[in-house]
Amino acid sequence: MELKECVKRMEPALLQCLQENLRIPSVQGEPEPGAPYGREVRKSLDHILAAAEALGFATANMDGQLGWCEYGTGEEMIAVLGHLDVVPAGDDWSFDPWGGEIRDGRIFGRGTMDDKGPSIAALFALAALRDSGLPIRRRIRVLWGCNEESGSGDMKYYLAHKGEIPVMGFTPDGEYPVINGEKGIINVTYAREMDQVGDLRLISLHGGTAPNVVPSSACAKLSCSKELAQRLASLHAPKLRFTATEYGLFVEAEGVSAHGSTPELGENAIGRLLLALDTLPLEGQTKETIHFLAETLGMETDGLSAGIALWDEVSGKLTLNWGTLNIENGSLQMKINYRYPVTKAYEDCAPILDGKFTAAGFTKTAEMHKAKLYVPEESELVTTLMRVYREQSGLDGKPKSIGGGTYAKSLPNIVAFGPIFPGDEIREHKPDEFLELSRLMENAQMIAAAMYEMAK
């Protein structure tokens, strides 16, 4: 039977498996024995490994860090690498983010596009390739990681425990045709203490869910006299609400969520809130801190005022996302996610940003750095995937660079390939994340064809 027909026959089982896994809220949680990234992430991994075993594949679970199934008997191995962990659902959904609901030819839920949909499609693509009877000389391993959204500690564990390195492979966690360049990514956490003085005091402030998500909402509580609260509550500004309360003033800011790699597609609610607070009569270190943050970051997405506005011809501008800010009784913690161009280096930006924050009284308390990635267009890996893309889609195109970071940086000989086609609406990390059912099956077919071309 032709490979295309074998993939088509997998559709009902693929949809059922995907719906079941989408109903598991696999956001990183507290570590437990055998579940280093939380109970729900482990449930998601157990579910997909059980599905692989039901299809007749041998599976492996590496201490809850990641798992895989495999087909074939060759000495060399090619890999398809996806992830089951997802970012928090956030607000403003029209559907249950953990429902896996199918409506109007789309399946909705957190992880449909990033990355459960394509990762689970890879399992059924492997089953289709096996059922087709096409001969292969290399083993094919489909891996499911559990920590892609929060540092890729799973891949570090895989390499540290001598996990097998593929001769080539891909992660269906980017865009078509092929992503051969990925910006360097830095997640940094800053903290500081502020005094509480004056008639108007900042009690608390909260905004954002993760460093790699543009925050869609932020709010602040301020203590002040009833008279001052009533006067400030009369203020009006777009996407801001000022409300007088029994303790003083409550300020809410609205934004637009987007993926942290493309912050320019969103509107940062934290930045909007800080720009508003900067106009209020705060005093002391609180005033200084709010002014510094509003002036240095605000709602900018290119790091211009922070002094790190880098650019190159291959991958474009540095991008910066102010992902979280939390203040309680004068204690502040915040996280920034920024991504530098593929021809630049960590040293071109990190020391500059750190220096600005240190000079303003902040302390850097944590940092995660993923180095840039660039695979030449003429490499066997890129040319093979480009050929598959052209043959399967009927479309042309060129390899591209992105700001998003994938497992391609974590495992040698890997690039990102799919699942997003040119012109598709991108809903990853946003409310109402979905994947067109037709695109799900096109991805399954593309993955199966790529597996075969690499393994034959």
Model-derived features with residue positions:
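Acidic/His- and Gly-rich active-site-bordering loop/insert found
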Residues: 2-110, 131-136
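An extended, acidic, His-containing surface patch that forms the Zn2+-binding/catalytic region
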Residues: 60, 254, 261-329, 339-351, ...
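Active-site metal-coordination/substrate-binding segment of hydrolases
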Residues: 77-144, 150, 162-167, 430-438, ...
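Acidic, glycine-rich active-site loops and adjacent beta-strand->loop/helix elements
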Residues: 84-86, 140-151, 172-177, 209, ...
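Acidic-glycine-rich active-site phosphate/pyrophosphate-binding loop
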Residues: 87-103, 190-197, 243-253, 358-359, ...
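Beta-strand segments within the central parallel beta-sheet cores of soluble alpha/beta enzyme folds
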Residues: 137-145, 204, 291-292, 366
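Midchain, well-structured core segments that form catalytic/ion-binding scaffolds
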Residues: 156-157, 161-341
